[in-house]
């Protein structure tokens, strides 16, 4: 297992904020307990993006929950990644799916779900939800069950 400080380039260093969508800032580190199934949850209450049509800002709380396997996302890199959506034009549903797919690519988790709780615009709230369970495992069935039993 590589030294933790060798795996991470952002933590403990001066922060450079990207001005547009930047999945390359995401960093992962080794899970010290890959034999255990356990949840990791991030609540990101200050997410912003832009409406791709009007350019108006959209505000949301993004909730990310996952069951790690070998890799885990480093929280400062996640913060910078989410911040990179600030000037990015995407619909709410796109943001949630993009975030989930980027995290799957980074970590290959056993299971992940991402929820966006967007502030109402025009009197309508949008709460997109996306999830993934690793194919061929109990987590695939878990993902289907959680998706089909959402409110």
Curated annotation (Swiss-Prot):
Gene3D superfamilies: 3.30.1130.10. Signal peptide: none annotated. Substrate binds at residues 73-75, 92-93. Belongs to the GTP cyclohydrolase I family. QueF type 1 subfamily. Catalyzes the NADPH-dependent reduction of 7-cyano-7-deazaguanine (preQ0) to 7-aminomethyl-7-deazaguanine (preQ1). The active site is at residues 51, 58. Its main location: cytoplasm. GO terms for cellular component: cytosol. The keyword Oxidoreductase applies. One of its GO terms (biological process) is queuosine biosynthetic process. It catalyses: 7-aminomethyl-7-carbaguanine + 2 NADP(+) = 7-cyano-7-deazaguanine + 2 NADPH + 3 H(+). It is found in: Cytoplasm. Pfam families: QueF. It comes from the Bacteria. It is an enzyme of class 1 (oxidoreductase). Its EC number is 1.7.1.13. One of its GO terms (molecular function) is preQ1 synthase activity. The keyword DNA repair does not apply. Keywords: Cytoplasm, NADP, Oxidoreductase, Queuosine biosynthesis. Pathway: tRNA modification; tRNA-queuosine biosynthesis. Transmembrane segments: none annotated. This is NADPH-dependent 7-cyano-7-deazaguanine reductase.
């Amino acid at each position: 297992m590589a030294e933790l400080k060798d795996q991470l380039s952002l933590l403990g260093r001066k922060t450079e904020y990207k001005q547009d969508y930047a999945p390359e800032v995401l960093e992962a580190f080794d899970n010290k307990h890959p034999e255990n199934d356990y949840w990791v949850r991030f609540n990101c209450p200050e997410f912003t993006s832009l409406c791709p049509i009007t350019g108006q800002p959209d505000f949301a709380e993004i909730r990310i929950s996952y069951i790690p396997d070998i890799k885990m996302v480093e929280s400062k890199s996640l913060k910078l990644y989410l911040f990179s959506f600030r000037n990015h034009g995407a619909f709410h549903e796109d943001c949630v799916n993009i975030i989930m797919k980027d995290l799957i690519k980074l970590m290959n988790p056993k299971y992940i779900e991402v929820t966006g709780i967007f502030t109402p615009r025009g009197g309508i709230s949008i709460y997109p939800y996306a999830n993934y369970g690793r194919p061929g495992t109990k987590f695939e069935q878990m993902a289907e069950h959680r998706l089909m039993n959402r409110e």
